[in-house]
Amino acid sequence: MSSTSDNNANSAREKKPLKFVSEGVGNVEAQRIREQVEQKKYEAEYKRKTRKSLRDQLRSNAISKQKQYNGLVRDRESFTRLSKEDLEFYQKSKNELLKKEKELNNYLDVKAINFEKKKKALLMENDSTTNTEKYLETGTSLGSKTQIKGVKTSSPKPKIKVSIKKLGRKLEN
């Protein structure tokens, strides 16, 4: 029931309401023809107002075709594109890798600084012992090199010379 009433309501909106002929005044057939002509004028005016201009029609067609083309391209290239989840996973793994690399660099920097401090301390310690040895050696009477207890002297290391000789062979033809 509601669908028929909706159809009647739609048709009533589209059509101009008919005028009733007063009793006995005019010809019913002439009045009906006049009403049909007026109704056609009303419908033509309605269509003219609702119809898009040629420019608007062409523009809307171009937009719809572009959307359709973009959809086809997206479908065709979908297997080569990464989804949002894939991109998030890639970004997350990249961030984790950068974080680990940064931690490793920090660790290496701290260890390098500690190593340099220890190296300086050992060099300072070695320098102080070598300075005292030199002082003790040069400070002895008669210029002799006598050893004093508790002072280490550097022992000369044997020098090794290695020479490589080429064997001269002549190839006979």
Curated annotation (Swiss-Prot):
Q: What is its main location?
A: nucleus
Q: Does the keyword Transcription regulation apply?
A: no
In its keyword annotation, does this UniProt entry include Nucleotide-binding?
no
Could you tell me which Pfam families the record lists for this protein? FAM192A_Fyv6_N (PF10187)
Q: InterPro entries of this UniProt entry?
A: FAM192A/Fyv6_N
Which domain of life does this protein belong to? Answer: Eukaryota
PTM annotation (N-acetylserine): residues: S2
The record's GO CC annotations read: chromosome, telomeric region; nucleus
Keywords, alphabetical: Acetylation, Chromosome, Nucleus, Telomere
Q: Where in the cell is it found?
A: Nucleus; Chromosome, Telomere
Q: Name one GO biological process term.
A: double-strand break repair via nonhomologous end joining
Q: Which family does it belong to?
A: Belongs to the FYV6 family.
Q: Function of this protein?
A: Involved in telomere length regulation and required for survival upon exposure to K1 killer toxin. Promotes fully efficient non-homologous end-joining (NHEJ) by a mechanism activated in postdiauxic/stationary phase.
Q: What else is on record for this protein?
A: Present with 468 molecules/cell in log phase SD medium.
> Under what name is this protein listed?
Protein FYV6
Species the sequence originates in: Saccharomyces cerevisiae (strain ATCC 204508 / S288c) (Baker's yeast)
